[in-house]
Amino acid sequence: MLQITNLVKRYGSDEPVLKNLSLTVPERNVVSVIGASGAGKSTLLRCINRLVEPTSGDIELNGVNLTKLRGGQLRHARQRIGMIFQGFNLVERLTVMENVLSGRLGYVSFLRAAFRRFPQADIDRAFHFMERVGIAHYANKRADELSGGERQRVGVVRALMQEPEILLADEPTASLDPKTSEQIMALLRSLSEELSLPVLINIHNVTEAKAYTDRIVGMRYGRIIFDGAPTSLDEAAMDEIYAGTPVDDRAADQAAGRPLETVPS
């Protein structure tokens, strides 16, 4: 389970990008995060995997406080967080199998990684997941020869090879056509159920969020202002999520006496 409490991210002296944000994602739950550009959706995901350092607050994954980890402990924790990217983040000149096995780099020695001599168990696991998502027949094909949907499937398998405790997906369908987008969203949902994995998806397509996720979180300029079932996301909720400006929200925060961040005691 992912538990986020009073998360704040501030760049320099600017207004926080994330403002006292709290969120829980249980196992076997697919949660989508929607909101206008600049709402803080991508920053939230990057704080979870510590690609961006939180300013304050706590992020716990299965009882481990990720914000307190440093060095080797942080590297080990990152191995357990699978990340799926909008731009796929594949090494184009490498084969599908080589890209997939890169998900095991944190588990093998430097020499094994350098010479791509992965244990047979890793290779077997790679074939298992490639068959599951329908790309096993592309194992020896270069990544730059694949379609967008095929590349994203490679990205999904690479994340699964990390043996993750959670999957984070940052706009996983933004570069895909509508049919392929639906296939990828359906795949993420089924994998969550099969592997008892929590999945947190940053997504712009509200229709896909309503069709393929268990819960929708609506963000507006650093705050969560909607958190509920897809069926409860009505026009009024949509207007609240996508209306306004940062200036309007700052004025509303001041009028309501809402703090931008909690000062640790």
Q: Model-derived features: where do they sit?
A:
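Helix-to-loop junction immediately C-terminal to a conserved catalytic motif
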Residues: 49
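ABC ATPase NBD coupling module
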Residues: 66-82, 112-120, 233
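Conserved catalytic motifs of ABC-family nucleotide-binding domains
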Residues: 163
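Helix N-cap at the start of a conserved alpha-helix in ABC-type nucleotide-binding domains
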Residues: 178-180
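Catalytic Walker B motif of ABC-type/P-loop ATPase nucleotide-binding domains
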Residues: 167-170
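Conserved ABC ATPase "signature" region
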Residues: 64-65, 108, 112-137
